[in-house]
Amino acid sequence: KTYERCELARAMKRLGLDGYWGYSLGHWVCAAKYESNFNTGATNYNPGDQSTDYGILQINSRWWCNDGKTPRTKNACKIQCRELLTADITASVNCAKRVVRDPNGMGAWVAWTKNCKGRDVSPWIRDCGL
């Protein structure tokens, strides 16, 4: 499923991401835009460590989920990676909450660091009635 911007913002807010670990909702929506273009079915393979990034927030199989093919996965979110590809973003949000608690915070997302960090992210939730 490809979410509309405000539709995603509403879903993320409902699931408790607004202000989670100190990051406003705009940061999460911005990250999703640049990681997956709001597409829950997005996957990207990383040849270097043979891992794959999954879903709307491109959560990585080396550390966070199990896809049955990534060597030495840690599976810190204790989920199957395919659960991160569903139209319902609950699993992605729950795992993202685990990711962001690490010392890097949202810095775990390269696209966030490049495109959202230190920027005014309020336009990402503008006119969404939130």
Swiss-Prot record:
It catalyses: Hydrolysis of (1->4)-beta-linkages between N-acetylmuramic acid and N-acetyl-D-glucosamine residues in a peptidoglycan and between N-acetyl-D-glucosamine residues in chitodextrins. This is Lysozyme C. Belongs to the glycosyl hydrolase 22 family. Transmembrane segments: none annotated. The keyword Phosphoprotein does not apply. One of its GO terms (molecular function) is lysozyme activity. Disulfide bonds join C6-C128, C30-C116, C65-C81, C77-C95. Keywords: Antimicrobial, Bacteriolytic enzyme, Disulfide bond, Glycosidase, Hydrolase, Secreted. Pfam families: Lys. It comes from the Eukaryota. PROSITE patterns: GLYCOSYL_HYDROL_F22_1, GLYCOSYL_HYDROL_F22_2. Signal peptide: none annotated. Gene3D superfamilies: 1.10.530.10. Lysozyme C is capable of both hydrolysis and transglycosylation; it also shows a slight esterase activity. It acts rapidly on both peptide-substituted and unsubstituted peptidoglycan, and slowly on chitin oligosaccharides. It is found in: Secreted. One of its GO terms (cellular component) is extracellular region. Its main location: secreted. Monomer. InterPro entries: Glyco_hydro_22 (IPR001916), Glyco_hydro_22_CS (IPR019799), Glyco_hydro_22_lys (IPR000974), Lysozyme-like_dom_sf (IPR023346). The active site is at E35, D53. The gene is LYZ. Residues 1-130 form the C-type lysozyme domain. Lysozymes have primarily a bacteriolytic function; those in tissues and body fluids are associated with the monocyte-macrophage system and enhance the activity of immunoagents.
